[in-house]
Amino acid sequence: MNLIAVGVNHNTAPIELREKISLTDSMARSLLTELIDSKLASEALVLSTCNRTELYVVPAMPEVTANYLKDYLIAHKGVRKEVTRDHFFNYFACGAARHFYNVACAIDSLILGEVQIIGQVKTAYNRAVEMKTVGPILNKMCHTGFGLANRVRSKTKLTAGAVSVSYAAVELTQKIYSDVSTKNILLVGAGDTAKLAAKNLLDKRVRDFYITNRTYEKAELLAQELGTGKILPLEEMTERLHEFDIVVTAVGGNDHIIKKEHVAAAMQKRHRDPILILDLGLPRNVAPEVGQVNNVFLKDIDDLKMIIDSNLEKRRAEIPKVKHFIQKELIEYARWYFSLEVKPTIVDLQEKFFEIKALELARIKNKVSAEEYERMEQLSDRIIKKLLHFPITTLKQQTADTTDPVSFIRNIFDLKEQEEEFPGLTFPINLKEQNNN
C-alpha cells in the first residue's frame, strides 16, 4: 500500500515544538498545493490541531519517503534549528491508516475520548476535498474513519463521563440536583475556567443565572458573550448568598472569597435548604471550614479530580473494544486497496476468457443456425462468469497463498483439498541436487 503518514503530536514532542510546526488553514492549503503541483504526491491530507500536525501522503515519486516528508514540512515552516526528524512519528501503508483511525476515534488524543477531534479531522478532509488533493485512497480512508468514530460514540462508552474540571463540576451538580434547570446559580469569576463552567451549566437550560466578579466590567463582558446572565456586584454577594442553590467559584488570588460565617448566615435565611458550592479555584476560593456547615455540600478541585480519574479509567476500559472495531475496518480497507491493484489483472483475465470464447464460437458459426449460435453464446457467457466468479472474489480478498503455485491455483478455483496419494511418504533428498551429481 503506497501510503505514508508523518507528523508531530503530544507523544513525540513538547508543546513548544508542536507550536513551531503547527499550520494555520492558509499554511495547510499552501502545503497541499505545493505537494500536488510539484508532482511529489498524488494525494495529500493535512491535519493540524493544538496537539498535532500530521501529513498523510500518497507519494508520486520513489524519492518521497517518510524522511523526505519530515524534512519538507520542517523546511516549509522554516524551523530547521528547532525541529528535527526525531520529533516526528512515521507510519506506512496499513499502519498509516490505523493511526488515522486511532486519531479519528480519539484513542490517540491527549484527553482520551475527546469529542472535538472528529470535527477537526472532518475540517481537514473538507479542506483537502476543496483543494482537490484527495483521491480514492485517502477518500476511502477518511470515510472509513468517520464511520468508525460514529460507531465508537454509539457502541462504546469512550466519550462518556466528564474529564475536565468544568464539566466534572456540572456532572457532580447533576448527581446532587436531578433538575439543574430549576436552580438559582451564582458564578463567581469571569476567567476561562468560569466561562467553561458557565457554558456547561447553560447547556442544561439553566434559567436563573448570576455572574459576579472583582471587576464588574469583566462580568458584563462574560454575560454578553454567553448571551445570558444577570450581574451581581461583588460587594452584595455575601448578603445575597442565601438566594442561590448552586455557587461556582473560579477566581484568582490567595484570599478566601467565601468564608464560614457568610455561609452560616445564608443557611439560616434558607431555612437549612441545601446549597452546593463548587470551588474551582487554585488556590481555593472558599474556606475549607464552610464544609462543616450543615446541609452545605462543598467540593473542590481534588473532589472533581476523583470524578475525572474514575471516568478516565472507565474510558480506558473501552479501548480494546475500539481497537477491535478498528482492526475489522483495517482488514476491509486493506482488501479494498488490494482489489485496486488486482483490478487490471481481473479485467485482462475476463477479456482473455471472452476472447477464447469468441474464437471458438467463430469456428462453428457457419455450421449452426442463428438461434443455436445465440444459445451457445449465452451458455458460454454463463459458464465463463461461473468459472471466473470464485477466482475474482479470491483475488479481491487476497486469501490465496501466492508462495505455493499449486495451493494458489487450488485456492482461487475453490478446489477440494487433495488427498495424499502416498500418505506419510516424504522425499528428504532434493531431486534437483541429486541429478546434478
From Swiss-Prot:
CDD domains: NAD_bind_Glutamyl_tRNA_reduct
EC numbers on record: 1.2.1.70
Protein's UniProt keywords contain NADP: yes
Site (Important for activity): H99
Active site, renumbered: C50
Disulfide bonds: none
Binding, substrate: T49, C50, N51, R52, S109, E114, V115, Q116, Q120
Residue positions binding NADP(+): G189, A190, G191, D192, T193, A194
Note: During catalysis, the active site Cys acts as a nucleophile attacking the alpha-carbonyl group of tRNA-bound glutamate with the formation of a thioester intermediate between enzyme and glutamate, and the concomitant release of tRNA(Glu). The thioester intermediate is finally reduced by direct hydride transfer from NADPH, to form the product GSA.
NCBIfam families attached to this UniProt entry: hemA (TIGR01035)
Described function: Catalyzes the NADPH-dependent reduction of glutamyl-tRNA(Glu) to glutamate 1-semialdehyde (GSA).
Name recorded for this polypeptide: Glutamyl-tRNA reductase
Underlying gene: hemA
